[in-house]
Amino acid sequence: MRDIEVRCHGGISIISAFAQRFGASVSIGLEMGVRFSGAVQFPGGSIETEKTLGFLLKKYPGSTIPGITIESDIPQGQGLKSSSAFTLALVVGFTAINGMNISELETLRLAAEASIANGTSITGAFDDLCSSYYGGVCLTDNASMDLLKRYDSPTGLVLIAYNPEKYRITGSMDISTLRKYSESFTPLKDLVMNGYPLAASLINGHLIGEITGMNTDVIGYFREKGASYVSQSGKGPAVFAVFHRKRDLDDAVRYFPTGTGFRCISTGFTNEGIRVSDK
């Protein structure tokens, strides 16, 4: 049996689909690599890994269970799409190692089902899966699991601020409050369709942040340092800032307040999609 590696990216929320059926996200340079090797009785790993493989084995009885090794640059539980990248990589690797021939759309819908089954998503996060699979900006109908539009990422340098001691797990969120404000999210779809993903992302983050809470001190700091767009990434709690001048980003990192528990990661948007290679 061949060994393979699957590599894909995290992302930033543009429209969170908790409140209504449409979702959108944009891929960023933070990457996850998952290596699949040989056949094992039990691969070990996290409960999410167990649940994902259990879901896939129920779907495809008699399939080979591969050994799995995960390396990731994507902070977990921060709204940066680490769970979607993880689930997508597992589904793509599992189907590849078992020689299954399924279409891109079938793969993405299977990953959305797996995301619900493993408890990392409430809606299936079809938008996040699409941006990780294709790169760039993806707008989706998460109810019908259809890709409505995909286009290249906006320009700009991205700075992420997050506190590793504070995180939010999507599967444990109460989204009933968000759904009460579904009409507030309705205009965001048109913004994305018309090529304004960062404007939509800014509004989306602030709408959700009003309910979940957000770090206004960090947001205000990045604004002072010249960021063009600053918001919480979806449910957060990570904050992202987009700069158009490198010296502004460098200053934001250099003078970031100490003793806050926050870490900063410099990255960028990416149009690179998922890659599968033999190892």
Question: What does each model-found stretch correspond to?
Answer:
Residues 38, 164, 241-245:
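Short beta-strand-to-loop capping motifs
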Residues 62-67, 94-110, 247, 251-256:
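Phosphate-handling active-site elements
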Residues 80-106, 133-135:
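DPxDG-like acidic metal-binding loop motif
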Residues 105-149, 219:
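Alpha/beta catalytic cores of group-transfer enzymes, especially the acyltransferase/condensing modules
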Residues 153-214, 220:
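Acyltransferase
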Residues 193-279:
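Glycine-rich, charge-dense phosphate/pyrophosphate-binding loop(s)
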